[in-house]
Amino acid sequence: MKKIGIISLIVIIIDRILKVLVTNNFVLNVRNKIIDGFFYITNCHNEGAAFSLFSGNVLFLIFITLIVLFLIYRTINKENVNKIGIFAYGLLLGGILGNLYDRIFYGYVIDYLDFRIFNFNFAIFNLADAAIVIGAILLIVFEGSDNDGRKNKDRSRKLRKEWKNR
């Protein structure tokens, strides 16, 4: 649990630093070219969740976030989390808490990473969002794996046996 907390804290600190830098150095809603046609910094405020879903419902989003945090906490405490899981949960919690901070103190999330791929304008997001997505993907892909990322066959067999013996 301690390692998960350290990873989360690192994500939160880097996320806060980047959001403060963007807020202090980039005009709101102005696209700033970093790599022409591909990567821009665009300081914008997202009052909703991903893709501005539930926009304007800050209290609802805070409430849902607190429920998700509680569920993750319970999951971490119930399961034996491997190295990949520690990293994944650290990213996930750091990202969730980074965006929760914004919602509580500003009423919106500060987004700034703006990518265009083949003239397709992808959603503007932030480091916390990226941490959430990467953490979730790692948990999905490596669920039930041992420390090296290999499927833990013994654990699977044991769980199947327990289920059959009910």
Write out the residue ranges for each language-model feature.
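Alpha-helical transmembrane bundles and membrane-interface segments of multipass inner-membrane proteins
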Residues: M1-R166
